[in-house]
């Protein structure tokens, strides 16, 4: 099982690198290092019952870290753009400390979180919603109320709470 977990970590790190997601790549990589040292991550995933690659164990760990940042963990939030933070490669040692701390402090919550597969819908698509809904609001002059019926589990209902970077000519 240890080899399968290492393979899952390697695969996810590579995918994040190819997709240009340095923060998630480093979160997964630091969890991988912690696992290899026998730290809290090894304790959390020891005895995993399924296939760690198919079950997206590394993404579950990364998802928990992001969830904690969104829930107000200031030590992690400072790295996540979705929380108004910024991550740079030089921050990796501080990120390692923050990750170890949150997994240690929130071990029970992490165990509960790891039971569920991650929601992997791409919320970046919400940028188009922001533009479209801004135009609708401008034209109608009315407040916008939304309901989402579909596969994204309401993620796009929060389009106004995401952080956007727009390129301007």
Q: Where is each model-derived feature located?
A:
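Rossmann-like AdoMet
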Residues: 1-145, 152-169
């Amino acid at each position: 099982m240890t080899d399968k977990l290492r393979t899952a970590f390697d695969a996810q790190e590579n995918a994040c690198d190819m997709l240009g997601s340095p923060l998630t790549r480093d979160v997964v990589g630091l969890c991988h290092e912690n696992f290899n040292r026998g730290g809290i991550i090894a304790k959390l995933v020891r005895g995993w019952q399924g296939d760690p690659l198919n079950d997206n164990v590394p993404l579950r760990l990364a998802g928990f870290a992001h969830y904690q940042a969104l829930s107000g963990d200031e030590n992690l939030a400072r790295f996540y753009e979705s929380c108004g933070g910024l991550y740079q490669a030089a921050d990796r040692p501080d990120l390692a400390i923050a990750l170890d701390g949150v997994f240690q402090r929130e071990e029970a919550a992490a165990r509960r979180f790891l039971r569920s597969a991650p929601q992997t819908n791409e919320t970046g698509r919400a940028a188009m919603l922001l533009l479209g809904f801004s135009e609708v609001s401008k034209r109608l002059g009315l407040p916008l109320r939304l309901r989402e019926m579909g596969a994204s589990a309401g993620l796009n209902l929060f389009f106004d709470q995401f952080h956007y970077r727009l390129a301007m000519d």
